């Protein structure tokens, strides 16, 4: 018996020697986390940037909180809001977590504490951390021009959080936000509660022209400033070849006191026929006639004259218009000259109509097979990639329909044809009804050739529009097409 006990004592002694270091480690860890937590700094997770610390951070950023006694972390708060974290990424000296995208920011609510706060059983650690608001932007300046000292101006835009300064300067700030040497600071301003407008008073000795800068904590927003009015800007035109009698819409900026809209240098739109939006970023008018040559629309407002970038009425690019350019060959379709009493109400002479009631699961219903007149290589060089070209046309959809779709094919290449197409406005991104709209599709979605010359080398003039109804119920449609053209993107 004594030998057995002696043997057991020896085994227990050896086991004790093995367990003792482990207990010591656990004891040290417990001692380490049994103290008040401390945060030393915050860094990014990239090990190569481990020495780069910061206090400003964007929402959605993964960060490492470095400190001491963090192993027992129970809760984490950012801007006084509890945030989630994965306990698998918590050690005694660090916590890895992501700043939530949906966090309420101090820019929106200055009463929040701009800090990260960690709570354990033994205390609380806090560290100043500024979660950045979205970058500010300016769309326009609303004012009565010409602006005089003491006049009220409204800067319209968004994300005007934590405004640090508003100033005028003849120079733009540097890319890093550094101010120019000479600035005219404006101290009398007020930000609205949606952070979308800043109302200010024009200072004495007002600059003739330069830049207005809104300096926020996150970054700065800059816009051109002209005492006598900013130059208008055109960003888009609803159609480059609108049907006569249809409405043309131009979007942009600074359409203030529009005094002239000129079409291709040929004729003006009467000022009384021009409608300007309340925000001066859109004008519209009815096109009274078609220009006889391609050109550009120009808009004259209080700040000067600007031309549209895209060619307006690119007559040289038209490949089919049912009035002398190209020709219809065969197909069950109709041709209409609008008379104002029924759809499409207005037209540039003759247009193609695909109308009627189509039965369900009908894969051969209405079609128009035509010969096109391809654009000359003096207008579109043969080496232009097909990916750089688009097929445009005007389309009128009387009412929304469900089921029927169109196929557009060219050069007998039906394998590459555009299938399942429903007309959509290239301007609004949706199917407009009861009016003409410009549609635009990449030419590469209709043909399989690499270059425009490869396309021409097919030696075919075919262009076809085919209507089918793969839907499970019959449908009635009334759709018109005109002015097919190939243009550069």
From Swiss-Prot:
Biological-process GO terms, alphabetical: symbiotic process benefiting host; xyloglucan catabolic process
List the subcellular locations.
Cell outer membrane
Q: Which domain of life is it from?
A: Bacteria
The reply to whether Membrane figures as a keyword in the UniProt entry is yes
Topological relation to the membrane, as annotated: Lipid-anchor
UniProt keyword list: Carbohydrate metabolism, Cell outer membrane, Lipoprotein, Membrane, Palmitate, Repeat, Signal
One GO cellular-component annotation of the UniProt record comes to: cell outer membrane
Residues carrying the lipid (S-diacylglycerol cysteine) are 28
Where does the IPT/TIG domain lie? 57-103, 136-204, 232-304
Taken from the UniProt record, the cysteine pairs bridged by disulfide bonds within this chain are none
From which residue to which does the signal peptide run?
1-27
Give this protein's Gene Ontology molecular function annotations.
polysaccharide binding
Q: Where does this chain mainly localize?
A: membrane
Metabolic or biological pathway, per its Swiss-Prot or TrEMBL entry: Glucan metabolism; xyloglucan degradation
Residues with lipid group (N-palmitoyl cysteine): 28
Q: What does this protein do?
A: Polysaccharide-binding protein present at the surface of the cell. Probably mediates xyloglucan-binding before xyloglucan transport in the periplasm for degradation.
Q: What else is known?
A: Gut bacteria supply the human body with energy from dietary polysaccharides through glycosidases that are absent in the human genome. Xyloglucans are a ubiquitous family of highly branched plant cell wall polysaccharides present in the vegetables we consume. Enzymes involved in xyloglucan degradation mediate the conversion of otherwise indigestible plant polysaccharides to short-chain fatty acids.
UniProt protein name: IPT/TIG domain-containing protein BACOVA_02650
Please give the organism.
Answer: Bacteroides ovatus (strain ATCC 8483 / DSM 1896 / JCM 5824 / BCRC 10623 / CCUG 4943 / NCTC 11153)
């Amino acid at each position: 018996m004594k030998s057995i006990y002696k043997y057991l004592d020896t085994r227990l002694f050896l086991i004790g020697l093995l367990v003792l270091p482990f207990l010591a480690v656990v004891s040290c860890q417990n001692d380490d986390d049994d103290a008040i937590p401390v945060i030393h700094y915050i860094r990014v997770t990239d090990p190569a940037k481990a020495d780069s610390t910061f206090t400003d951070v964007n929402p959605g950023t993964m960060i490492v909180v470095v400190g001491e006694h963090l192993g027992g972390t129970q809760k984490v708060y950012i801007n006084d809001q509890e945030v989630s974290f994965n306990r698998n990424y918590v050690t005694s000296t660090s916590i890895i977590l992501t700043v939530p995208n949906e966090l309420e920011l101090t820019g929106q609510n200055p009463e929040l504490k701009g800090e990260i706060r960690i709570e354990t059983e033994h205390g609380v650690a806090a560290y100043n951390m500024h979660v950045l608001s979205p970058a500010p932007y300016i769309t326009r300046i609303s004012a009565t021009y010409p602006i005089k000292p003491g006049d009220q101006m409204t800067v319209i835009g968004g994300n005007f959080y934590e405004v640090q300064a508003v100033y005028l300067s003849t120079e733009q700030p540097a890319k890093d936000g550094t101010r120019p040497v000479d600035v005219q600071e404006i101290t009398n301003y007020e930000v609205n509660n949606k952070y979308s407008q800043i109302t200010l008073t024009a200072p004495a000795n007002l600059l003739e022209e330069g830049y207005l800068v809104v300096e926020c904590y996150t970054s700065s927003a800059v816009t051109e400033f002209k005492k006598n009015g900013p130059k208008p800007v055109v960003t888009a035109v609803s159609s480059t070849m609108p049907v006569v009698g249809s409405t043309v819409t131009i979007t942009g900026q600074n359409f203030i006191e529009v005094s002239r809209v000129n079409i291709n240098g040929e004729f003006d739109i009467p000022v009384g026929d021009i409608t300007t939006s309340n925000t001066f970023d859109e004008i519209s008018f009815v096109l009274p006639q078609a220009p006889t040559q391609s050109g550009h629309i120009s808009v004259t407002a209080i700040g000067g004259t600007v031309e549209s970038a895209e060619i307006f009425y690119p007559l040289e690019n038209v490949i089919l218009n049912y009035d002398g350019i190209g020709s219809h060959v065969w197909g069950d379709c109709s041709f209409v000259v609008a008379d104002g009493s029924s759809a499409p109400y207005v037209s540039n002479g003759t247009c193609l109509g695909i109308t009627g009631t189509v039965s369900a699961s009908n894969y051969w219903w209405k079609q128009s097979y035509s010969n096109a007149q391809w654009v000359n290589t003096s207008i579109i060089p043969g080496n232009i990639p097909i990916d750089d070209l688009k097929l445009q046309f005007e389309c009128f959809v009387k009412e929304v329909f469900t089921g029927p779709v169109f196929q557009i094919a060219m050069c007998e290449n039906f394998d590459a044809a555009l299938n399942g197409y429903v007309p959509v406005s290239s301007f609004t991104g949706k199917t407009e009804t009861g009016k003409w709209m410009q549609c635009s599709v990449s030419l590469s979605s209709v043909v399989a050739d690499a270059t425009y010359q490869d396309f021409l080398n097919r030696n075919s003039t075919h262009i076809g529009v085919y209507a089918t109804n793969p839907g499970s119920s019959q449908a009635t449609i009334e759709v018109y097409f005109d002015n097919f053209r190939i243009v550069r993107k």
